[in-house]
Amino acid sequence: RSLRERFEEAFWCEDLSIYALALDGQKRPCRVKTSNAGHCLYTGIASDEHARRVAETLMSDELFSGWGVRTLADSERRYNPMSYHNGSIWPHDNAMIAVGLARYGLKSGVEKIMTGMFEVSLVLDFHRLPELFCGFVRRPGQGLTRYPVACNPQAWAAGSAFMALQACLGLSIIASEQKVVFNYPILPEFIDKMQIKNLKVGTASVDLLLRRHDLDVGITV
């Protein structure tokens, strides 16, 4: 059997609509709703049907706080929005989930994550994305709750915005053929126009102008 078949059999939790966090010492699934399941979309090992259901779970109120996807669902016994790994929100984790969603064509979730990241940046000093922040539910008129000892700046947090944007654009590069590919690009509502200048692919380079329309994104080279 293929790796995907064995993975699906071992990790899929039908009643939870998500992949198990791990297998214990007796190979029993740890039936916990976590953001880690989004990484299965990032790697491409998830089946199309299960990817769609995982996306719905990740975007539900259990896991999506309004600012981002929590590491642990608020319905879980160990949930603590101020815990380092049991309910906090990590920008790099969300960016990987966004790329995974884009891989399966689930762009509404990508836009939701990208918008959350952008709005997080608006309420923080220097508009920097931190290593992590607390997973309390978002409330109207209130900012997020910071994680007191989160590194800021931090490299993988800083790179998360670009990774999430890449997911929105469906952007990939085939260096051997000097190609830039956009797969069903979208731009979130807060971006009407975007310029990418001097994008280098091998020995070539290109300038791009992207404009958001009601139903699609126009690209001018």
Residue spans of the language-model regions?
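Alpha-helical packing segments of well-folded alpha/beta enzyme cores
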Residues: R1-L3, D93, I113, S160
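Beta-rich accessory regions
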Residues: S2-F7, E14, A102-K112, A175-E177, ...
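Extended glycan-interaction surfaces of carbohydrate-active proteins
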Residues: S2-I89, L122-T145, M163, L169, ...
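Aromatic- and histidine-enriched alpha-helix N-cap/loop-to-helix transition segments
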Residues: R31-S35, H85-M96, A102, N152-G159
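Alpha-helical support elements that line or immediately flank enzyme active sites
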Residues: N36-D48, N94-V110, M114-M117
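Composition- and surface-driven signal marking solvent-exposed, interaction-prone regions
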Residues: V54-A55, K107-G116, L129-L132, E177-V180
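Glycine- and acidic
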Residues: N80, N94-V99, T145-V149
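Catalytic cores of secreted or luminal carbohydrate-active enzymes
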Residues: Y147-K197
